[in-house]
Amino acid sequence: MQIGIYSSQSTDTAAKTIKKILDDNGIKSFSATKLKGKQVDCVIVLGGDKGVRNYFHRTFDATLPILGISEGEASGFLAQIDLKEFRTYVDVLKKQKYTVEEVPRLGVKIDGRNVYPVLNDVAVFSSKSAILMEHTLRVNGEEVWHDNGDGII
């Protein structure tokens, strides 16, 4: 088994902790920034929900399962395991006894052009203030809302 670890500078200490736990359990791991050409079973993303959103913003790869890990007291929606609990989940990872939950991404078009896919929300505003814009919200291709305003979240 091989696992990528995605972290930011603020989570480097946590990344070292995760790497040590994985090494101690015979699981190969390396920085997710060095994934190119390597086969991995999943990617561990540090930094809570923000870290998960940053990962998907920077990598557009939605094919690999990710495990979001938070370092705070509260678990999030996208990162549901706390760093303090990670050691208890290693065996589950090793035996691949987990289920992958598909989280739908939002597709956004501005002036008919696709922009980056997003996870849970998007804000669209004019580059000039107080400009009226026309918005159409479609869910699975079906129009559910149409309005004018100075922006939309």
Residue ranges of predicted features:
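ATP/NTP phosphate-donor binding region
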Residues: 1-46, 51-58, 81-100, 110-116
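Catalytic core of DAGKc-family lipid kinases
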Residues: 72-151
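A short, gly/pro- and small-residue-rich
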Residues: 55-71
